[in-house]
Amino acid sequence: RSLSERGARLALIGLEKAELARVAASLTGEADHWHADVTDAAAMLRTARLVQERFGTVDVVVANAGVAVGGLFRHSEPDAWRRVIEVNLIGSANTARAFLPALLDSRGYYLQVASLAAFAPAPMMTAYCASKAGAESFAHTLRTELAHHGVGVGVGYLTWTDTDMVRGADQDSTLRELRSRMRWPASRTYPLAPAVDRLATGIERRARHIYAQPWLRTAQLLRAALPSAATHRARRALPALEPASATIPTTLLGAGGAANDPAPRSDA
């Protein structure tokens, strides 16, 4: 909505077909939507062609599809753990590959949505942290390959923000308890609107780094110290949480996780 109000024409792509249609219809500017799974490389290629046929040009691509699971790695369900990597990392690469020809034509901009989890390890979030670290590195490396073509590549960083994924995480009693033991400002859930406005402004500026919460810029500067700090706090928090974590099923969090099913996901 923020981008639409700033004059962007929008192509919305994702799994939640009814939600995509509802949002597209609610926007003030021109918009269309396609139902596709980012982990399906062939479907993303077809969808990219349809988007280009519909709009003629693609100036900006935002790779924002993401899912998460919680729980200790040794108790995690392998397929759910793998799915997080497939969506968050492989899906981002599929998105970039599908739209890269259009971005090369327009000398456009690709934004990879990452997370504080890309450089700050969070216990019980191994798949999410690994996927976001990989997505961050992928985007930085892609920038080096595309700079001489005039294509910009940015990385967006968010911490706990009021989305359906975070609300889903708060329904997991062990994750909720673990979060309550974090220090401020990492323990807080941040409102969506300011984060979205910073992302939209960063897209307009073709920014290399976008921090949805301003304090993440400082955290980025301290990233070398964060693994040791996280380990120190986990030593104290995890002994009380491990027994409960072992009994909680590994499920994808939030509405995005609920939309993840084995049925075919592309109309393209």
Where are each of the predicted segments found?
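SDR active-site lid
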Residues: 144-214
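Substrate-binding pocket helix/loop in short-chain dehydrogenase/reductase
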Residues: 72-73, 77-82
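Residue(s) in the substrate-gating loop at a strand-loop-helix junction
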Residues: 115
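Active-site helix of classical SDR
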Residues: 96, 131
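Active-site loop immediately N-terminal to the catalytic Tyr-X3-Lys motif
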Residues: 73-74, 122-126
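The beta1-alpha1 cofactor-binding region of Rossmann-like NAD(H)/NADP(H)-dependent oxidoreductases
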Residues: 17, 36-46, 78
